[in-house]
Amino acid sequence: MKKTLVALAILTAAGSANAGINLYDADGVKTDLSGAAEVQYRQTFKEDSDAELRMDDGDLAVNTTVAISDSLNAVAAVAFEFEDGKVTNDELWVGVAGDFGTLTAGRQYMLADDAGVGKDYELGGDGIDFVQANGDQVVKYVFDNGQFYGGVGALITETNPDNNADEASVYEGRLGARFGDFDVRAYLYSGEDVNTDNFDVFGDDKVNVDIDGYQIEAEYIVNAFAFAASFGQVDYELASDSSQKIEADTAALAGSYTMNKTTFAVGYTYWSPEAKGTVKKMEEANVFYANVTQQLHSNVKVYGEIGSSDTDNSEFGYVAGMEVTF
């Protein structure tokens, strides 16, 4: 009962905190609650599509850290995602953390989920896509000493949605370094029997593909300006027939300027797929976008974005949205 009362008191007092709400902090145990809600009015690039009010994002997470000793902590998290009218438990993991880094295991997002330098909200086009970026059987290790950082991860096995005999497996790595305001990093990714419906050019709605790729990224911040660039290559090979594949090059440029609580950003994304075998040819894409974000509060922002793609049968896109976090 005492813990409950303390949690309620802190919940009330910390309602405006932008890094989550501290529910409990005593006896070496710290527990935080965080969440986000985001709604947009969006017109996509798709030709003849109608603008729609879209529930873009809803998240709720509880994270805890327990001090086992002066140099070792136990960590855990449970998180839920609200999307398409459904509630999904997208994170449930445990681990240990210390000066050596953090080692976690369970249902969680992989390092590949962080890849990308775009400053867009919705209209940035197709950038790097490693397809499988989370799973139930993920083991991940990350390390960061301030200047150098890195990590390795593995999706040990993941039964495909169709419950067939093939199970996906993924191995990945990230290595980066910071030199003052300059940050450079690289991602490596290799997956087998990854189930996806992203590529109808293979002839089926859903197929299993083997994926191998990399992404190199760089970011530089000078005063109120931020610049970013990336280049990556990914091969998508049909698991049942290695002669059928897509080799894709992707690149991105982005920049932003922040003035008080307003941020202006522009960006460009390039996507160039090359089909091999009898795979249907895919279209090259050049996408440009611009947006402005107004930070009304440390927990509240509103934004507007416009974008244009040179692909066939595409039209001008726009987005207006609002996000509230706690």
From Swiss-Prot:
Signal peptide per UniProt: 1-19
Principal place of residence: membrane
Gene Ontology cellular-component annotations: cell outer membrane; pore complex
Membrane topology, as annotated: Multi-pass membrane protein
Keywords, comma-separated and alphabetical: Cell outer membrane, Ion transport, Membrane, Porin, Signal, Transmembrane, Transmembrane beta strand, Transport
GO function terms (MF aspect): porin activity
Domain of life: Bacteria
Induction text: In response to elevated hydrostatic pressure.
GO BP term, example: monoatomic ion transport
Subcellular location: Cell outer membrane
Transmembrane regions listed in the UniProt entry: none
Keyword Membrane: yes
Subunit structure comment from the entry: Oligomer.
Function as written in the Swiss-Prot or TrEMBL entry: Forms pores that allow passive diffusion of small molecules across the outer membrane.
Sequence similarity: Belongs to the Gram-negative porin family.
Protein name in UniProt: Porin-like protein H
UniProt source species: Photobacterium profundum (strain SS9)
